[in-house]
Amino acid sequence: MSSGQQQPPPPRRVTNVGSLLLTPQENESLFTFLGKKCVTMSSAVVQLYAADRNCMWSKKCSGVACLVKDNPQRSYFLRIFDIKDGKLLWEQELYNNFVYNSPRGYFHTFAGDTCQVALNFANEEEAKKFRKAVTDLLGRRQRKSEKRRDPPNGPNLPMATVDIKNPEITTNRFYGPQINNISHTKEKKKGKAKKKRLTKADIGTPSNFQHIGHVGWDPNTGFDLNNLDPELKNLFDMCGISEAQLKDRETSKVIYDFIEKTGGVEAVKNELRRQAPPPPPPSRGGPPPPPPPPHSSGPPPPPARGRGAPPPPPSRAPTAAPPPPPPSRPGVGAPPPPPNRMYPPPLPALPSSAPSGPPPPPPPLSVSGSVAPPPPPPPPPPPGPPPPPGLPSDGDHQVPTPAGSKAALLDQIREGAQLKKVEQNSRPVSCSGRDALLDQIRQGIQLKSVTDAPESTPPAPAPTSGIVGALMEVMQKRSKAIHSSDEDEDEDDDEDFEDDDEWED
């Protein structure tokens, strides 16, 4: 038995057969024009003629005719190629009941799809070989179709022995008087049979019944894109499956098997609904808006601490409103704006000595600037604008002149501009109190600038989960298997097609 099974494979393998009139290089180029998994069983240089309505032969083209076994399409074709340009000039499929005639040794005719066609061969030897290859192929196909028509158990005749098993026939043959007994037994049997008949009441309702949606998949044509379920279409789009893959016979079979293994269409739909993540993202929290108001409310409290309300500079000259923060720091300090924003907690650290009225608070603060660093937290009541308290000695000259003269205010502004230049030297001097706070603020700014770069694009591997990820993994394995297969393996696969009955359909 083993030897009998090993004999069929050798004839199945088909190799390319070139033309006798072409060089080996031209034959090799011809084989490459055939396409993947296609083999030419015979090749010859020919002229193609077609019969017009006037029953006159007209030349259509010249080239190399090939009897092609097209494994992807599972059919046989007569194809003519132009070996110079590598183009397919004409083709004719070998349909069922195809008849191949040879009125001349070099002139062969057959019925095409639209008209009568003829091949005029350049060499009679090639014409003989080509005709033999075509007729042998047609003969094999004819035998296969006949085998398919005849049932496998056709020659067996079991009916000859059936009459022996029938007791009624034997009684009729040998015993006439027993006919009455037979009729009685028949009536009894009929009565029993009537009792055993099932009614609608005896038929129970179906159990474990599940309605499984139709996937719309056909083994030969793949998925029906016109009637494809929208949810399945969405799944295929998420997985990056193209329409060509859905139409491909083998790839669509892999996808169909995956759907069946996961429980069918309904199970896939339910899984997709479970994994749907759209609801959570829309929640745009309202917390962001509330936090900003507290920051805006922060600035008002500091000025309230300075017995007056707004800082003195604006009260003296409304046009000088922007510069007040700088003059407030005649001493060594960092840029005025940052401390003003961060100052609400340390603002109470104003010196106890500030007898001057509300308008001139900035100068009095400068007088006792030397004492300011130690007691900043405890004395919130002392007057003074939010950030102005500084430690300069220049403020002593301003104490007698805080009458509100614009010249003094301009001097303070100028001094503030000088402080901006000195702030680089003042950073190392800071040791406690407001200066320490300024250093912290500066460090915080540096940290912010450092944290801008590190993180860029982490969110990528999230979507590959659940049924989508499983299907994507299956498709990746499928693509790897396709790309990793060599042409030699493809030829080995072709061996199984020689006697495949599906080609007859």
Curated annotation (Swiss-Prot):
Record's compositionally biased regions (Pro residues): 276-349, 356-365, 372-391
InterPro entries per UniProt: CRIB_dom (IPR000095), CRIB_dom_sf (IPR036936), PH-like_dom_sf (IPR011993), WAS_C (IPR011026), WASPfam_EVH1 (IPR033927), WH1/EVH1_dom (IPR000697), WH2_dom (IPR003124)
Presence of the UniProt keyword Ligase in the record: no
Domain CRIB: 203-216
MF terms (GO), sorted A to Z: actin binding; identical protein binding
Modified sites of kind Omega-N-methylarginine: R307
GO cellular component: cytoskeleton; endoplasmic reticulum membrane; nucleus
Record keywords: Acetylation, Actin-binding, Cell cycle, Cell division, Cytoplasm, Cytoskeleton, Methylation, Mitosis, Nucleus, Phosphoprotein, Repeat, Transcription, Transcription regulation
Principal location: cytoplasm
Lineage: superkingdom: Eukaryota
Localization per record: Cytoplasm, Cytoskeleton; Nucleus; Cytoplasm
Pfam hit, one: PBD
Subunit structure of this chain's protein: Binds actin and the Arp2/3 complex. Interacts with CDC42. Interacts with FCHSD1. Interacts with FCHSD2. Binds to SH3 domains of GRB2. Interacts with the C-terminal SH3 domain of DNMBP. Interacts with SNX9. Interacts with the WW domains of PRPF40A/FBP11. Interacts with PTK2/FAK1. Interacts with PACSIN1, PACSIN2 and PACSIN3. Interacts with NOSTRIN. Binds to TNK2. Interacts with SNX33. Interacts with NONO (via second RRM domain); the interaction is direct. Component of a multiprotein complex with NONO and SFPQ; associates with the complex via direct interaction with NONO.
Protein's name in the database: Actin nucleation-promoting factor WASL
Species for this entry: Bos taurus
Gene giving rise to this polypeptide: WASL
